[in-house]
Every structure is written in structure tokens, then in C-alpha cells.
């Protein structure tokens, strides 16, 4: 079959003369209508450093597509800057943007009968939004990551955006003065690229590389380095070959490749958001994959990389140490990866990794040897109990107090909790509960980076637990539990918690328990009434009506 089998619907035959006339206006010539039309879903934006370099990559891809015999068509997708909207009402739109990105890419590609897609993204929701769309479309596709930001520097230490969030808590606790807070602010983000630790953007780019939907080594490159532009060019060339071979996303996004992605996320110490996003990608690809699969994988995979937020290094350090291919080779050698999974290049994972050393280089400390892992088991645990019968997600590795039982401090929103923290009203041993921040209740499932960072900045990160039906940033660490499901708005037990109730977070037993009798819970449940929707018009109102529970990925279809 021809490489332009889809676009023939708009380019072939006498009755398509009007269609061709429009295409001629955007640069098509007589010899171009037999070429495959490839969409470039360009997330370029000056809203955020994560995306401000994407236009350069899109132009590299556009040029390479033309040289390889394809006809590129550029179109835009939105982005939301989580770092800028964090801690505000605007953060409610962050997870919503994942769906908008997915829907917009699907809409454009289907409407214009494109033969292939290059999706280019940077900020957190760009990656899962794009992969959801590519899985739905199932036309030859590749993802190009915009790249990671380089670390900032101040007083001899590396900084990331999380340094600035934690500095707010340090400032509130009078550990640093106004000038030092300002200097951290000035130096935390030195240029283009996504947030530099193993936060959500770098986690998801690593997962996409592990699934074979992007090129090897591409997920840890610095945004401003020349190799990132070379990678964008090479991605376009590989995609044209994939169109010829009809390598489709659903032949790459399989149960085995999702297991590979989760395995890599565990090994690099990735973000809790990976659980939500990989469930959503699996749903889009119609793959049978569930929240309990994460726990099964966690139990057998060590954390091999010493990366921020809880570790010492950033993504550019990981890149210099060998990147995701080095991590994957170690996992493959020890039987924890499926080497027979196909990649966009047409090679299997095992073939891609054939020339990668089995052991990390001795002159680096980012990737540990197999017999000296950072932690012996994965860090993203699925906690269950009467507070989260559908599951909740916690980062448990490195927590100094893996078992906390304490009085509940209940807040109906992130803002009220943040005020209490900065007013020094949270004490060691407390278990903070932030509810009505779930997918429907928020709506939008905001990330709680501001309160968790403030707790750490005030020295309470090891002594205070925090649970929420909202999410956490990839920059969060400490005894925190998110994605509590069912959420409060849906009548989950988290809605029934009262101030002072005893709550247990037990990482070892993977337990999240409200220590209140079932009789008392039944009394409270009978008296509970769902709150009125916070929004009755617009995108948040639509989202709240459509979105599923977090334990299914907060999907909308």
C-alpha cells in the first residue's frame, strides 16, 4: 500500500480538486500529493521554559521530513505551566490540559487525514497528552521531548525549581532572609527546558523512551544542547521509515511495554504522576493494565538512580552517566525488562540495547551498581485500606518514618492548608488531610507541591504525614499519599474524616487507614451530603462531569 494511504482521502481524484487547491496555498506542488502528509504537533509556547525551545525542534523536524520525502504540516497544541500555576486556582486546569492536548492532536490528525505524527512537548502534561492521542489515532507516530533544563547554581549548590518552593518554607520558618530567598528565585531556572530533577516531565519522557515511542537517549538530553536538535532531525527520519513499514503505536504500547515503562520509572525514582498517566495511556491503547500492576512491579525493581527530588543529581547528570539506555540495559540483564518489545525504529528493545555496557561507568555516582542500589525496592507504592479501597499512591523510599499514626488535621482545600502551615499551626506527628481536590471535586486534581515543600522548608517533612485526593508534583517527597480513591466528592471515606481522628500511614504494610469504627463511619456516611459543584460552566464543569476516578487514570472517555 502507498505511504500516503490516509491522506489520499483528501488528495486523490478529480473531486478533490478543491482540497488540493487549499493545500497548494500552503506550499504543496504538483509532485507532492503522492507523498505522506505528516503532522507536527508543536507545543511551542513562551508561557514556560519547558516549551520555549520547541519551535526550534519543530523546524528541525520539518526540514528533515521534507528531505525524507514527506510533506510536513505544523499545528499547535496548548500547554499549561504547572510551576507557574502551582498553588493557585489555575492549577485546576493542569490535568485538564492533558485531555485538551490529547483531544486537539486527535482532532487535527483525523480531520486532515494525516499519514503520521510527530508530537513535540515539554511541560508535564504534554507527554501523556500526546501519547494518549497517538494511542487513540494508531497512525505511525513518534514523540520528541523538548529536553530538560540545566541546573541553576547558587553558593556552590545545584538548584531546581523545587529549591524555590522549599525556600518559601525556609523563609517562613526564618531559616533564610529575604535576600537569600530572592537569590534562590533568581538562580533556580537558568534557561530553557523542563524542570531538571526526576520530576514529572523527565519521568514521563523516560517512560516514553522505555516504551519505544521516542529515540534512545532522547529523554535526558538538555534542551539547549545541539544533540537535542540532532535528535529531532533523526526522529523525523525514523518516522518516515515507520510510515513505510506501518509501525503503529498500538504495536509499541502493549502490556509488556507498559510493564517496561513502569519498571524504568521505579528504577529512576520517578514521579507519582506516572501512575495516573500510564493508566490513561493504557486506557487509550485499550491495554488491560491496572493500578495493582504498579505494586507488583514495585516489589521486584530496585531504585538504581540517585536523582532529585529525594536524591542528589538531576537529569543532565543521568544523561552524562549513560541515560535511560544504561538503566534499561541493567534491568534487561537482570530479567526485569521485556527485551522483545518493538520500538519505533523497528528494532526490539534488546537490539537497541545490544551495545550498551552491562554495568554503569565507575567514574559516576548517578546510576548505582546492581549490588548497591539506592533502595532495594521501588518507591511508588499503592496503599489500600478503608481510606483508599481503590488505592492511593505514595512515595515510600527514603522516608525516615515509614509508619505514622497521628491526629488528622483536615482542610477542604490546598489554600487553607497552606495558610495553616505558614502560620506554624501544623505540629510534628500530625497527619494533614487535604480533600475535595480530586478529579471531580477540585475539579482537576491539583498538585500539592506548595504545602509539601513548605512542610519540608519548615523542617516537618519527616514528622508530618499528608494525604489528599489531589496529586503531587514530581518534585514532592516525604511521607505523602495522593490519588486517594474514591475521592471526597464521590463520597469516599476521606470525606468522612473529622479533625483529630487517628490516621495510620504504614508504608511497609502499604496501608492507609482511618482508625474509626465502622459503626461511626456509617453514622457519618448517612449524614454526609455531596457539596455543590464549584463550577457550573466552562471547561472545568465539563471535565468534572466526564472524568473517571484516579484509580483508572482520571480519563474522560
From Swiss-Prot:
Residues with the modification N6-carboxylysine, per the entry, are: 125
Q: Which reaction does it catalyse?
A: (2R)-2,3-dihydroxy-3-methylbutanoate = 3-methyl-2-oxobutanoate + H2O; (2R,3R)-2,3-dihydroxy-3-methylpentanoate = (S)-3-methyl-2-oxopentanoate + H2O
Q: Where does this protein hold Mg(2+)?
A: 82, 124-125, 447
What is the active site of this protein?
A: 473 (proton acceptor)
Q: Which biological pathway?
A: Amino-acid biosynthesis; L-isoleucine biosynthesis; L-isoleucine from 2-oxobutanoate: step 3/4; Amino-acid biosynthesis; L-valine biosynthesis; L-valine from pyruvate: step 3/4
Q: Alphabetically, which GO biological process terms does the record hold?
A: isoleucine biosynthetic process; L-valine biosynthetic process
Which domain of life does the protein's organism represent? Bacteria
Q: What's the Enzyme Commission number for this chain?
A: 4.2.1.9
Q: Which cofactor does it need?
A: [2Fe-2S] cluster; Mg(2+)
For molecular function, the Gene Ontology terms on record are:
2 iron, 2 sulfur cluster binding; dihydroxy-acid dehydratase activity; magnesium ion binding
Which positions in this protein are listed as binding [2Fe-2S] cluster? Answer: 50, 123, 195
Provide the cofactor note recorded for this chain's UniProt entry.
Answer: Binds 1 [2Fe-2S] cluster per subunit. This cluster acts as a Lewis acid cofactor.
Checking Gene3D superfamilies in the record gives: IlvD/EDD C-terminal domain-like
Pfam families named in the record: ILV_EDD_C (PF24877), ILVD_EDD_N (PF00920)
Q: Which residues form the signal peptide?
A: none
Q: Which UniProt keywords apply?
A: 2Fe-2S, Amino-acid biosynthesis, Branched-chain amino acid biosynthesis, Iron, Iron-sulfur, Lyase, Magnesium, Metal-binding
Q: What does this protein do?
A: Functions in the biosynthesis of branched-chain amino acids. Catalyzes the dehydration of (2R,3R)-2,3-dihydroxy-3-methylpentanoate (2,3-dihydroxy-3-methylvalerate) into 2-oxo-3-methylpentanoate (2-oxo-3-methylvalerate) and of (2R)-2,3-dihydroxy-3-methylbutanoate (2,3-dihydroxyisovalerate) into 2-oxo-3-methylbutanoate (2-oxoisovalerate), the penultimate precursor to L-isoleucine and L-valine, respectively.
Family per record: Belongs to the IlvD/Edd family.
Q: How does it assemble?
A: Homodimer.
The protein's name? Dihydroxy-acid dehydratase
What organism is this sequence from? Nitrosomonas eutropha (strain DSM 101675 / C91 / Nm57)
Amino acid at each position: 500500500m502507498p505511504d500516503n494511504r490516509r491522506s489520499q482521502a483528501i488528495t486523490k481524484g478529480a473531486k478533490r480538486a478543491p482540497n488540493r487547491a487549499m493545500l497548494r496555498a500552503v506550499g504543496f506542488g504538483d509532485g507532492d500529493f503522492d507523498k505522506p502528509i505528516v503532522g507536527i504537533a508543536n507545543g511551542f509556547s513562551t508561557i514556560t521554559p519547558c516549551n520555549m525551545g520547541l519551535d526550534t525542534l519543530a523546524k528541525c523536524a520539518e526540514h528533515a521530513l521534507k528531505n525524507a520525502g514527506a510533506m510536513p504540516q505544523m499545528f499547535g497544541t496548548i500547554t499549561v505551566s504547572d510551576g507557574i500555576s502551582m498553588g493557585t486556582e489555575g492549577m485546576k486546569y493542569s490535568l485538564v490540559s492533558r485531555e485538551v492536548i490529547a483531544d486537539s492532536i486527535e482532532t487535527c490528525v483525523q480531520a486532515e487525514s494525516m499519514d503520521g505524527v510527530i508530537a513535540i512537548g515539554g511541560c508535564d502534561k504534554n507527554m501523556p497528552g500526546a501519547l494518549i492521542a497517538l494511542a487513540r489515532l494508531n497512525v505511525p507516530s513518534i514523540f520528541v521531548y523538548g529536553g530538560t533544563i540545566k541546573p541553576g547554581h547558587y553558593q556552590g549548590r545545584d538548584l531546581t525549581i523545587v529549591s524555590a518552593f522549599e525556600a518559601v518554607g525556609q523563609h517562613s520558618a526564618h531559616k533564610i532572609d529575604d535576600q537569600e530567598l530572592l537569590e534562590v528565585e533568581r538562580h533556580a531556572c537558568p534557561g530553557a527546558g523542563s524542570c531538571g530533577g526526576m520530576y514529572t516531565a523527565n519521568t514521563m519522557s523516560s517512560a516514553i523512551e522505555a516504551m519505544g515511542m521516542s529515540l534512545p537517549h532522547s529523554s535526558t538530553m538538555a534542551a539547549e544542547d545541539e544533540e537535542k536538535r540532532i535528535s529531532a532531525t533523526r526522529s523525523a527520519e525514523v518516522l518516515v521509515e515507520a510510515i513505510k513499514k506501518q509501525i503503529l503505536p498500538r504495536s509499541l504500547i502493549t502490556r509488556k511495554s507498559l510493564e517496561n515503562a513502569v519498571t524504568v520509572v521505579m528504577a529512576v525514582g520517578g514521579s507519582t504522576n506516572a501512575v495516573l498517566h500510564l493508566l490513561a495511556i493504557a486506557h487509550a491503547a485499550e491495554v488491560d493494565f491496572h493500578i495493582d500492576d504498579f505494586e507488583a512491579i514495585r516489589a521486584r525493581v530496585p531504585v538504581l538512580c540517585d536523582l532529585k527530588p529525594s536524591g542528589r543529581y538531576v537529569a543532565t547528570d543521568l544523561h552524562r552517566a549513560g541515560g535511560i539506555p544504561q538503566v534499561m540495559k541493567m534491568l534487561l540483564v537482570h530479567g526485569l525488562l521485556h527485551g522483545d518489545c518493538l520500538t519505533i525504529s523497528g528494532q526490539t528493545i534488546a537490539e537497541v540495547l545490544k551495545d550498551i555496557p552491562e554495568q554503569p561507568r565507575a567514574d559516576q555516582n548517578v546510576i548505582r551498581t546492581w549490588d548497591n542500589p539506592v533502595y532495594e525496592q521501588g518507591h511508588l507504592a499503592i496503599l489500600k485500606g478503608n481510606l483508599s479501597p481503590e488505592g492511593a499512591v505514595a512515595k515510600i523510599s527514603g522516608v525516615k518514618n515509614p509508619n505514622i499514626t497521628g491526629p488528622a488535621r483536615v482542610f477542604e482545600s490546598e489554600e487553607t492548608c497552606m495558610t495553616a502551615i505558614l502560620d506554624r499551626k501544623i505540629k510534628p506527628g500530625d497527619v494533614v488531610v487535604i480533600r475535595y481536590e480530586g478529579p471531580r471535586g477540585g475539579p482537576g486534581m491539583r498538585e500539592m507541591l506548595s504545602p509539601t515543600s513548605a512542610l519540608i522548608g519548615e523542617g516537618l517533612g519527616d514528622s508530618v504525614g499528608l494525604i489528599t485526593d489531589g496529586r503531587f508534583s514530581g518534585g514532592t517527597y516525604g511521607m505523602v499519599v495522593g490519588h486517594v480513591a474514591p475521592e471526597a466528592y464521590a463520597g469516599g471515606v476521606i470525606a468522612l474524616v473529622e479533625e483529630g481522628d487517628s490516621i495510620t500511614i504504614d508504608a511497609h504494610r502499604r496501608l492507609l487507614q482511618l482508625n474509626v469504627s465502622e459503626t461511626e463511619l456509617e453514622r457519618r456516611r448517612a449524614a454526609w451530603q455531596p457539596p455543590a459543584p464549584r463550577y457550573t460552566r466552562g471547561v472545568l464543569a465539563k471535565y468534572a462531569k466526564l472524568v473517571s476516578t484516579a484509580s483508572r487514570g482520571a480519563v474522560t472517555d
